[in-house]
């Protein structure tokens, strides 16, 4: 028989059952109070949880205030990355994982096309220029080349608009058209379209143009006024505009890291369609933030796996036709329209 049972029966005889029952209830209540007083870890955890919730709410408020403040800056400030603090990005919209970067795609295109001339807008550190072995021109108002280059190069430290206004802009190419171009300049749709118009005029039917940042991963990356460190701007609008106004072009969006790439072929240097329509696109291009990015862009259903594009035998045939001076390569380029999309 247990000691507690023996003591309990003895107390029942001496004090009476009702008194003993009151004492037992008081004992249980006392034990509970003591446990609560001694459970320091639980009380600290509770306070920590409350503090984290408060800090999270404060952090979200500060982030919202920062995004609002950044949105009141000028367009010029949106490209000034030096010494600026950006808001943390939003979660990315789910999309198929990209297996290649833009530079890896560009490198493979250099190998496949062996371009005689290469033109680039947006030199920055020179990482993409380093891929070229052709006679090359690079345009960027603030480039800081930090890598070894291996091409016959002329650079212009000015905006692309100023460059295209020069009478001697393409003298370095000695009259040859652009074989391969990479547009990675100002991340605003009207600038990107103007760059494409000017580049196409100096291309041939067999030329290839690559445009970066056409597949933002969330709406914040697509803001016209930069808020986050990772920024694509509203260049994504180019895909819709080109598809609508220039159905003759072959457009192949690629699922590349980080923010997608657009390959454009079947060019027509004589076309004036885009230039004629440019002024009428103002409202569409300059729509205020936040931008309404189409779902097939965010999810990349519209895109092609870059490996499929690069594996096509179109490239070898395109080089042969280019070197032979063939004028009509449209049927060849149209084969790329058959590449399966991720959606």
Can you annotate each of these PLM segments?
Residues 3-182, 186-210, 214-343:
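A short alpha-helical cap/connector motif
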């Amino acid at each position: 028989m247990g000691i507690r049972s023996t003591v309990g029966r003895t107390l029942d005889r001496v004090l009476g059952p009702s008194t003993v029952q009151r004492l037992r209830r008081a004992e249980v209540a006392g034990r509970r109070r003591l446990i609560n007083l001694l459970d320091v870890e639980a009380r600290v955890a509770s306070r920590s949880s409350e503090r984290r919730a408060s800090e999270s709410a404060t952090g979200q408020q500060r982030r919202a205030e920062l995004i609002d403040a950044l949105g009141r800056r000028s367009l010029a400030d949106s490209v000034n990355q030096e010494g600026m603090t950006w808001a943390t990005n939003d979660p990315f919209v789910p999309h198929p994982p990209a297996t290649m970067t833009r530079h890896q795609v560009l490198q493979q295109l250099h190998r496949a096309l062996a371009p005689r001339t290469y033109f680039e807008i947006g030199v920055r550190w020179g990482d993409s220029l380093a891929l070229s072995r052709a006679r090359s021109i690079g345009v960027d108002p603030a480039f800081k080349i930090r890598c070894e280059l291996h091409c016959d190069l002329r650079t212009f430290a000015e905006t692309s608009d100023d460059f295209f206004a020069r009478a001697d802009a393409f003298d370095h190419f000695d009259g040859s058209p652009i074989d391969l171009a990479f547009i990675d300049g100002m991340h605003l749709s009207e600038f990107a379209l103007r760059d494409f118009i000017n580049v196409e005029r100096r291309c041939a039917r067999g030329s290839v143009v690559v445009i970066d940042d056409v597949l933002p991963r969330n709406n914040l990356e697509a803001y016209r006024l930069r808020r986050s460190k990772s920024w694509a701007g509203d260049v994504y609008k180019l895909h819709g505009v080109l598809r609508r106004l220039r159905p003759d072009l072959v457009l192949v969006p690629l699922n590349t890291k980080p923010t997608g790439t657009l390959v454009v072929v079947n060019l027509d240097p004589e076309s004036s369609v885009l230039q004629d329509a440019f002024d009428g696109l103002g409202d569409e291009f300059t729509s205020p933030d936040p931008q309404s990015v189409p779902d097939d862009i965010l999810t990349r259903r519209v895109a092609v796996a870059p490996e499929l594009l690069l594996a096509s035998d179109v490239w070898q045939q395109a080089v042969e036709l280019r070197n032979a001076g063939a004028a009509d390569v449209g049927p060849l380029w149209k084969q790329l329209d058959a590449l399966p999309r991720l959606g």
